[in-house]
Every structure is written in C-alpha cells, then in structure tokens.
C-alpha cells in the first residue's frame, strides 16, 4: 500500500517541484542565517528524493547550487571591492572569506547524495569526508575563479606590506596576514596537492619579499656596525623571522614553508657574508672569546661548508699555542716528568674548556681538538727519542719520535713507586693522576715505547719491592686494558704479578723446609723470585759475576728445592736483577746498605782485608765483572749523590767512570757514616741501588732495537692479515687499513710501510698488479 502511494506521488518528486522549497534554505545557509531543525531535515530528504526519482535531478541540483553560490560570491566581492584602502580591503575580504569558509563545511552535508549519483561513490556508514565533497569543491572553485583570482595580487601585496611594516617595528593586526594565508591554504580543491595555490602564491611572495628586505638591510648594517655586532644582528633576525614564520606561514607536517623561509634568511643574512664573518674566527680563538665564537658557530652551522674553516682555525691554534707553551716551559719539563705531564694536562683542559664553552662539545670540534692535541703530544721539537736499527751490522736511525711516552711512563713510576711524591698523596689522588696519564696516553702515537718503559719500571718496582700500593699497581694493569692497550702486552703485565704471588708461596715453603737446617745464609734472610721468561722478557745476555761464598752455597739448595716441585723446568739465575742488604760496621757506627749483587760482589772483596787498597785490575779479577759493569758499579760506590761520605774512596780523582785506569786504587772509607741535619748518625739505612738500571748498556740497546724489530714484524703481520682478507687492494687503502690495525701500538712511518711491502713482494707473499703498480695482489 505504501509503495503504490509512493509511485502515485512520483510526479511531485521532480527537481522543478522541490527546488522552490530547497532554495530558500540554501540561501539562508550561505548567508549564515538560522534554519529550523525541520527545514534542515527536509533539505536532506528533498535532495535524496530528487536524486532518486528524477533522472537528471542530481545535475540540476548541482547547476542550481552553482548559480546561487556564484551570485552570493559576487555580492561578497562587491562588498570587498567597495574598500579602496589596502588594510580595509584585507579586513573586508577576511570577514567575507571566513563566513564563506565556515559554510563550506555546513552546506555540503545535505547534498551527500550527489556523491553517489554524480560520482558513483558508495555510501558509507562512516562519517563523510567533507573535504572531498563535490559541493565543497564547487564552493571553493567558484570562490577561487571569481573573487579570489581578481583580487589575489592586491591581497598578497597588502599582506606583504604589513609584514614589511612589522619588520620595521610598526604594529598591526597580525590576523590580517593570517587570514590571507588561511584563504590561500584552504582554497585549493586539488586532492593531489591541496597546498598548491598557497605554495605558488603566498609562500613564494613571502619568501621573495623577505629576501629583498635583507638583501638591502644586511649589507648596510654590516658596514655601519662591524662584523661582531652584525653577528648579533643576524642571530636576532633569524630568531625573529622564525617566530614570524611560525605565525604567518603554514606549519602542517606536509608543508615545509618555515624551513624554506629559514633557508632564505640564512642565505641573505649569513651565507652572503660567510668569508667576512669567518675572517674574525682566528682572532676570537686566540683571544678566547667564547661567547662570540659560540654565536659564530651557531650561524656557520646553518651554512653549507661553514664549519670546516672554523675547525681548521681551531686545529691551527691548538697546535701553535700548545707547542709555544711547551717550548716556553722546555727548561723545566724536559727534566721533570711530573711538570711535563701537568703541562700537557693544563693544555688539554684549556682547549677542552674552549671547545665546551664556544662550541658546546660539538663532535666535529672535539675531533679537531683531538687531532691537534695529538700533534702537540707527538711533536719531537722539544725533546726526541731516536730508536737505532741495526741491519747487517750497520747502525741506522729511524725518524726521531716524541719522548712523550717515555716521560709518561716515568711519571707513572713516580706515582707507583715509594717516592716523596707518592708519599704525600692519598690513594684516591694517585688513582686520579694515573687516569690523567691514561688520558694523555690515548693521544700518544707510539704506545709501544710507553709499554717498554712502563714494563721496565714495573719490573724494577716488583723486584726491589718498592711499590707504593700493590692494589693500585694491579688496577693500573686493568686500566691499561680498558684504554685499548694490546692484549698480549697487558696479559704479560698480569702474569708478572702472578709470578710475584707464586714466588711468595714458594719462599714460604722453602723457609719451612730449611728452618732447622744450617745454611750458609739463614733461610729467613732469603727472598727468591721465580720469574717466567716469557712474561718478563729478559734479555738472553747473562752477566757473570763471582758471588760471595754464602750465596754460591745457597744456589744449589734453591735449585734442588725447585726441581722437587717442578720437574722438567730449568732455572736461569739473573744476578743482574738481584739485590740484598749488607751490614757495614766501623768505628763510627753500624749501617745497613741496600745494594745490587754487583755492588755486593765489589764490597765483599774487602771482607778479609778491610783496610787495604785494591786496584781496578784486581777488582776485575776478584769480581769477574765485565769492564763496563764494573766501572758503573764502582762509580755508584764512590760518587753516590745522596751521600756526603762515600762508601769507597779512590785515587787518583777522575771526572767519570770511563776515566778509571787499571791502576786506580780503591779503599773502604773507614770514616763512612750517614749524616742527617749536619749530625753524624751511629745507625741508619741507605739504598745504594738508586736509579741504577737492572739492565746492562747492551741490553738497553737490544731493547731499543727490539722495539723497531717488533714494529717491522707487526707491520708485516698486519699487511698479510689485510691481504688475506682483501685478496686485492690499492696502496692507499692498504696504508689506511694498516694504520687502523696498528694504531693502538704505534703509527707506522711511510718509509717503513714501503720497505715492508717491498720485502713481502721480494719473498713472494704479495705481488703488484700488472695493470696497476699501485695495486697489490695476495699470493697464497
């Protein structure tokens, strides 16, 4: 029944019958006049009915809407154009636009059925997307084609004039510019690029006017106020323009207007004057003007290639200022390793503070600081270390190196050994200073030299039992591991401590075994150290010395005891590394002397004849020491710096041990005593070992040469390692990778790299590519 009634009334559902009822509601909506709820619902149902029952109803509605919308817009245009003043025109346009744009969201809603019938879109239960509405598109396109296209240039120019006035300090209603921007942004109905109209017009005009403004203002300000004031001006204007851009330009995610504007401002304010600004950098760094440098940094960081010249200036300053300070203090630091390290740390802290305050610890500037500081640390201008290299009996000299690693090792020794310095410091202070050394060590190129000296000092401390703090000693080994020192080196240091601990247990067992035996020397007075040759790396050179009978008789007892517990192992006695305490008695008093085995052997020559004079020649026969070692040992007993009365006297007087002759006579000083505060002490103890090396001259030469030989082997190993992996590689790439592998030990010199490549080619480990002599190929 309902269906037949609907068919019966179909004639009343045509467009012509319904539009007269629909049109007044449409006009009310366009004019933002109120409509009743019933009128609103009727509009929905009438549109639906016409689209459903009138075959051409949808097209007719669309056309009628277009005519009414156009008429409404013409009226709005007339109201806008009635204003001749630019500001008044802007205000009028924005009022009309905002009213119209509000209706762009409301009017399309009742006409959703047009989407289905005209565009074939399927209806959805979801909320319709009004931005894609056919009626909304009609409204925006009509506004664009009529009013906007006619006055957009005036609108745009007026808005830009207001922005220009604001830049000059004049006040105005910012909503006028914002309103124009909103109009540009929302007018485009192109679904592919909804910001096209805005970008092609408003954004372009805004950027162009900004650039014109600063192309005029900036040069004038720079000329009148100078570079340093100009930097403040440029920085202030960039911040000001960014705030303005966030207010006047579109900021939605898919739009990059603000970024484009800032790039434009940077070009006009900074890039154009890049060279002029950068010319001030070097002077600012020298004067430590951190605030001004920070300002320059913030400006140049926005410019392509702006930072690199600043990095170069910083590097040059650190190197020149650092070396100048080192040269100025050369007289002190070359003789005092503590002062040397303090000087290096002072420089590091000074340059680090500059980088922090001026450049906010930017990684690029930290890298520049590190590179330049490394050059200072490794410079060989003030003092240098020359490592000799003997090949086929010919002594050669390698390129001089910085003595820094040796001095760092000496300073570590001062902190770790019982010295006046270590005694006045707490454990925490010693640890802090050692970590400062490790900080400097990070910049040392030839760490293998540090390793050699540090190990030599450690050997001496462990053998003589003169470590200030055994816990810190062992911590130092782990700290060296943490800073990237080679594992094989650190492991050997750890093994040295292990040997000392094992020796303590062995001594205890030896004393227990012989506590009731009568030895030439009581077991309690003997301290044996069994050291692993691989860890301690002692020279194969043995220095023979004729030992006192008491020691000679003890040696077989120790060997027999050791073999019972460790069969198959062989002991090699290193008298050079041994030491002991002897008692000196005379009419003045009784004194304990800490001496080396060589000093002991020399002094025991007088045991049976204390008042006789013995010639150099006879002492050589009695001790069987090599000439050089005997001279060195005698000099330590006749010219010990800390003694006012020496242990031995000699005649005739000479200036150095080299001047002793076969006939030089030596005798025990019967008036020997220890003097303290100008008073003779009847009892006391003195260490005569002093800084005597526990090595021979020849062994030190071997160690120096060993450093170079080890570098050669390490270089060859690294080249083979790279070639095995790469199979084929260019010379430049090979050198780069080689430095990377060896950097924790030493920096290989180009000459050495070239020589080892040639050696490997000669021995057929690698060959040159026939097509390119600078390319190498691995030969399995």
Curated annotation (Swiss-Prot):
Cullin neddylation domain sequence ranges: 711-772
InterPro entries noted in UniProt: Cullin, Cullin_CS, Cullin_homology, Cullin_homology_sf, Cullin_N, Cullin_neddylation_domain, Cullin_repeat-like_dom_sf, WH-like_DNA-bd_sf
Gene source species: Rattus norvegicus (Rat)
GO biological process per UniProt: cerebral cortex radially oriented cell migration; proteasome-mediated ubiquitin-dependent protein catabolic process; protein K11-linked ubiquitination; protein polyubiquitination; protein ubiquitination; radial glia guided migration of Purkinje cell; reelin-mediated signaling pathway; regulation of cytosolic calcium ion concentration
Keyword Chaperone carried by entry: no
Subunit structure: Component of multiple cullin-5-RING E3 ubiquitin-protein ligase complexes (ECS complexes, also named CRL5 complexes) formed of CUL5, Elongin BC (ELOB and ELOC), RNF7/RBX2 and a variable SOCS box domain-containing protein as substrate-specific recognition component. CUL5-containing ECS complexes specifically contain RNF7/RBX2, and not RBX1, as catalytic subunit. Component of the ECS(ASB2) complex with the substrate recognition component ASB2. Component of the ECS(ASB6) complex with the substrate recognition component ASB6.
Post-translational modification summary for this protein: Neddylated; which enhances the ubiquitination activity of ECS complexes and prevents binding of the inhibitor CAND1. Deneddylated via its interaction with the COP9 signalosome (CSN).
Assigned keywords, A-Z: Isopeptide bond, Nucleus, Phosphoprotein, Receptor, Ubl conjugation, Ubl conjugation pathway
Function: Core component of multiple cullin-5-RING E3 ubiquitin-protein ligase complexes (ECS complexes, also named CRL5 complexes), which mediate the ubiquitination and subsequent proteasomal degradation of target proteins. Acts a scaffold protein that contributes to catalysis through positioning of the substrate and the ubiquitin-conjugating enzyme. The functional specificity of the E3 ubiquitin-protein ligase complex depends on the variable SOCS box-containing substrate recognition component.
GO MF, any single term: ubiquitin-protein transferase activity
GO cellular component terms listed in the entry, alphabetical order: Cul5-RING ubiquitin ligase complex; nucleus; SCF ubiquitin ligase complex; site of DNA damage
Known pathway: Protein modification; protein ubiquitination
Protein name: Cullin-5
Pfam families: Cullin (PF00888), Cullin_Nedd8 (PF10557)
Lineage: Eukaryota, Metazoa, Chordata, Craniata, Vertebrata
Signal peptide interval: none
Chain positions found as Phosphothreonine: 210
Recorded superkingdom: Eukaryota
Annotated crosslink Glycyl lysine isopeptide (Lys-Gly) (interchain with G-Cter in NEDD8) location: 724
Main subcellular localisation: nucleus
